[in-house]
Structures are given as C-alpha cells and as structure tokens.
Regions:
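Non-catalytic terminal/linker segments enriched in charged/polar, low-complexity residues
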Residues: 1-125, 132-133
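P-loop/Walker A NTP-binding module and the surrounding RecA-like catalytic core of P-loop NTPases
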Residues: 74, 107-111, 117, 121-329
C-alpha cells in the first residue's frame, strides 16, 4: 500500500479535470491528438476543393476502409458526410495531393471524436485514492466480453502501482464466475470477497467495500454478473448494485470482435446505468478496433483501456493515435 506520506497531496482542481457519472473527479489525458495538415492549406491562390466524382471516390474508399475495420455504418456515414461538408470550399496548395489532404483531415476528425471526454485511467485512480479511499470500480457488460479477466488485469495493474486491491465476486448467478475470480485473486495475491451462488450481488459488493475500508485497502473492483442489455430485470439488479455501492467509476467492457452488437450493448448500458469509460477487449485478435470509434460516437464515452492478450499484463491505456493507424492504413 502507499503510505500516507507517499500519496500525492490533492492538487487544486485543474482545467483538464472532469467529473465521473457519480460526481467524482476524472483526470483528462495529456496525450496530444492533433494532426497538422497546415502544410497543405493556404489563404490565397491554390485550389478550392469542390464536390464531384474525384472527391466522392476518395471518400467512398475511406468509408469502405472504416467499415472493414468494424466501424458501424451510422458512425462511418456521419463521419464521412461531415468531412465532405468541411472539405468542400477549403483552399489548399496546388501541389497538394487531394487524397492525402482528405486522409489527413479524416484522421484529424477521428482523433477529435476519440479525445472528447478522454481521461487517463492511472492518473484518475491516483487522484481518487488520495482523497476518497477505498476507490470503487464497478465493471459491467454482457457475458463473454472478458469482464472478469479485465477485472483481474486491472487488479494486477493497480497492485503493481502499489495499491492494495480487493476483488468483489458480485457475479453470483454463476458459481463458475465466483470460482474464476477467486482463482485470479489467488494467482495475483489479492483478496477476493465472495458468497455462495445465488447470493445477493449488492450485499457482496457492499461487504467488499466495508472490508476494504476496515483493512485500509485502497481499491475495490466489483465484477458484476454479465447482463444482456435487453433483459430489464437483470439490468434492474445491476442498478441496485450501483445504488448500494455508489462506485467512483463504472467501466463498460466491450468485445472488439462484436462489431455493431458491442455498440448496441454500450448504448443500452449507457441509457440504463451510465458508465464513465469503456475497456475494449480482444484486440490481440484480427479485430481492427472500429468498434471503439462507434462506441465513442454512440455514447459520448471514451475508450480508456484496451485488452491485448490473455496475460495479466496485457492491459494498456487506450492510445487514440494507435487506433487511427489501425483504421486508416
């Protein structure tokens, strides 16, 4: 654990601070996203971009690339339409290749969307721990997305940073889920609070928080039951866990391979529960990550973490520049 003297003193509220869905402070990332296309722009002379078959062909090729990267049709169409409207009438140097100008503008537009509301996971946790320990992280999502494994990865990441972490096995609908999280906890050397199958999920989560507070642990990660977003009774049970625990952060876990299904899930979870950021899993597969852009577009919430493998260390802060390179090769 971080001793009190080692914890950062809470700084005055910064201009790059935001609030979570439960009113806690999120620290925006200082990653720079802007892509400079000024080398092609000019105030006089040059060439004015006009609509027509050449521009249409370039934009169609780029839209096909976005769609093949698992980006949803609605998000890609809106992005391309906005780009077309922005480009027409712009003045560029006569020697500027139009396809290069358009591609750079598209990358800038994508980065602009991804940086909207983007916050730094590690900095936010450190800031929250310094002022309101134990910090409670609630993990939500449907079955099969990698939620339990991601919970364990986050526990490992924070344990490596010196925090005492408690895992809460609040997925009480499946005995296998309880055993799985407990096994992760044993391997990681962290505590796991659990009950028998069929227990009260909210009670397990509450017990974990009270135990952490009593023992001076700094972070509680609640692994909730996988909920299909169209099952009202299950979503209501999840809302109960949220009401009882009042988490500092809610992380929605999405499967990069799920494509438009992941987007629909995110929309419904955002409507019923409201999450602060998403963790996109299974990016070690042949998924190119377009679902990340669609989720951000549809919910207004950022991707903050990505899973890149099955190992505990295969969890990284989301880098929007990396995604742009995946989408537009």
């Amino acid at each position: 654990a971080l001793r009190a003297a080692e914890r950062p003193i809470q700084p005055p509220r910064e201009s790059n601070a935001m609030d979570s869905t439960t009113g806690r402070r999120l620290i925006q990332s200082d990653v720079k996203f802007e892509i400079d296309i000024s080398e092609h722009e000019t105030n006089k002379g040059g060439m004015v971009i006009s609509g027509g078959p050449v521009l249409d062909s370039i934009l169609e090729d780029l839209e096909d690339e976005l769609l093949s990267s698992d980006m949803g049709h609605e998000a890609s169409s809106e992005l391309i339409d906005s780009l077309r409207a922005h480009l027409i009438g712009s003045r560029v140097g006569r020697g500027a290749p139009l396809d290069e100008v358009v591609e750079r503008a598209l990358k800038g537009a994508i980065l602009s969307l991804l940086r909207s509301g983007y916050w730094d996971f590690d900095k936010t946790i450190r800031d929250l721990v310094s002022s309101d320990s134990p910090v409670v992280i609630m993990m939500v999502g449907v079955n099969g997305t990698g939620k339990t494994t991601t919970s364990a990865k986050i526990a490992k990441r924070l344990d490596d940073q010196g925090f005492d972490v408690v895992l809460a096995a609040a997925d009480t609908f499946r005995a296998g889920a309880i055993d799985q999280l407990a096994a992760h906890a044993d391997r990681l050397g962290v505590r796991c609070i659990k009950s028998q199958r069929g227990g009260d999920s909210a009670a397990v989560a509450r017990d974990a928080i009270e135990s952490a507070r009593a023992k001076g642990d700094e972070v509680v990660i609640i692994d909730t039951s996988g909920r299909m977003q169209n099952k009202a009774n299950l979503m209501e049970e999840l809302q109960k866990v949220h009401r009882v625990t009042k988490p500092h952060l809610v992380i929605f876990v999405a499967d990069a391979l799920a494509g438009n299904d992941a987007v629909n899930q995110a929309i419904e979870f955002q409507r019923r529960l409201s999450f602060d950021g998403a963790a996109l899993c299974k990016l070690d597969t042949d998924a190119r990550g377009g679902a990340a852009l669609s989720i951000s577009h549809a919910t207004g919430r950022p991707i903050v973490l990505i899973g890149t493998g099955q190992g505990y260390d295969d969890l990284e802060p989301f880098n929007p520049n990396w995604l742009v390179d995946q989408l537009i090769s």
